[in-house]
């Protein structure tokens, strides 16, 4: 997911305790840097997705099993997956296809997440108030979709609207809201594509981050 100790140091320690040898990419390739921290070598606050995929390819033969965070590989980390809003997903889909091909040769375990309600405070200029506002906005109940209406495109089209069909009100800047919704759309499309390849992998696990017990 990123370079927080629970995601790398503790994983290595746990593996060592069982006699397993874990290979991790250089930290600079997967580190998340908050505002005010020194950026990675690629000049960003997030991991280097292209370099990470190349690292996987270069080290495939040295591994018996691959365990891959899709948020890291496709978005440069969990935090950036809540911010990245690109619409051209050609490279990301090709990366999933590449993992599927590797999975035909050895076990590949992939882990993904459903994007949480809020963005991250202290990242890309967002603060705790933005976190609160985004969480409230994301928690608003949306309309229910069933049957043939339950499609990725329809889910995305409904993001700006509440269960009553009216646009959800917020004091957030319109540009920030559009960015947030675009990030959600991107994340959903990538998870949908991943799940369509789920049978290729030894396991495909999708975790649910901060969420609401309603259609949101």
Where would I find each of the regions flagged by the language model?
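An N-terminal assembly and electron-transfer interface module characteristic of large anaerobic redox
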Residues: 1-216
């Amino acid at each position: 997911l990123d370079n927080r100790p629970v995601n790398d140091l503790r994983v290595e320690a746990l593996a060592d305790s069982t006699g397993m040898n874990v290979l991790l990419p250089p930290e600079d390739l997967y580190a998340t840097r908050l505002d005010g921290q020194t950026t990675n070598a690629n000049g960003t606050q997030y991991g280097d997705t292209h370099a990470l995929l190349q690292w996987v390819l270069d080290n495939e033969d040295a591994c018996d099993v691959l365990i891959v965070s899709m948020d890291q590989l496709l978005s440069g980390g969990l935090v950036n997956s809540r911010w990245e809003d690109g619409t051209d997903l050609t490279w990301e889909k090709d990366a999933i296809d590449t993992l599927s091909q590797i999975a035909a040769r050895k076990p590949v375990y992939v882990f993904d997440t459903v994007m949480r309600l809020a963005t991250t405070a202290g990242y890309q200029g967002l603060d705790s108030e933005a976190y609160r506002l985004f969480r409230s906005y994301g928690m608003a109940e949306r309309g229910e979709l069933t049957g043939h209406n339950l499609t990725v495109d329809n889910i995305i089209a409904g993001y700006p609207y509440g269960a009553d069909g009216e646009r959800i009100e917020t004091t957030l800047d319109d540009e920030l809201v559009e960015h947030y919704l675009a990030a959600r759309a991107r994340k959903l499309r990538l998870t949908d594509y991943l799940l369509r390849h789920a049978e290729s992998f030894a396991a495909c696990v999708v975790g649910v981050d901060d969420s609401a017990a309603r259609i949101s």
